[in-house]
Amino acid sequence: MAFKLGDVIIDRLQFGYGATKTKALYALTQLTNATIDITADSTDIKDKDGNLIYRKYSGKSGEVTATNAFMNLSVIEAISAQDAEIASSSNTIVMPIFKIVKAGETLDITDAVEDSFIVNALSANGSLGKAYTKGSDATATEFKVDTVGHTFTPPTDNEETQYLVKFKKNVKSGAKLTISGDKYPKAHELYFKALAVDKCEIGSYRACIIHISSFMPSPEVSLALQGGDSQTMDYKGAILTNACSTSQDMVEIYFVDEEEEA
């Protein structure tokens, strides 16, 4: 029997997928929702009494808004329009490190950058206290950096219980992403895959795939630096049309009539 168009129920959005023609850019597996809005300009033609006789539509435009449950570094990379720097044992990246060290304890500082240490007392209520300098040994006014044993020893100040230590380190595993004021994201393909249910066949899932051939991400981003359930990250942008193509396709919707695992 030939497939017939009709009502379908979107059960949930599985993921989003960004790519160029030759390279996958990111996968968003924690999308909580996505909305595609297509709007158009219109011109109303009315008679002498103001009655609407005809409405002419032109100039379609599209906007995409999606929400990811967590911060996604691949999306930040796409928005920043710069390749992320990936740290490895052969390509270390100097990164700032912050540690709270309790009095009487030591800190492993393997791969730390020498002479990059800044040490302050840290009170129980979180305020910064006196600053300390580097010395040949830990004293009431100095801290010790052992470059041979790769150990940091905090001051022996009897008035303090903990210290905030900032230093730089050659990191071998991690990434550095940079958002610059003069760089903007490029257009790429965007896909969404959702699981759909036929209203007459509840419990049987089908794949619904949305393809946007030219998606321009917005460089605007909000990074929620907090715990709890408010770590969402919005991802939005515009749908572009190709002025040099005979086809002005904006969005393609594929409904795959084959059963999918939930």
Please annotate each region the language model reported:
Residues M1-A262:
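Signature of extracytoplasmic/envelope-associated structural regions
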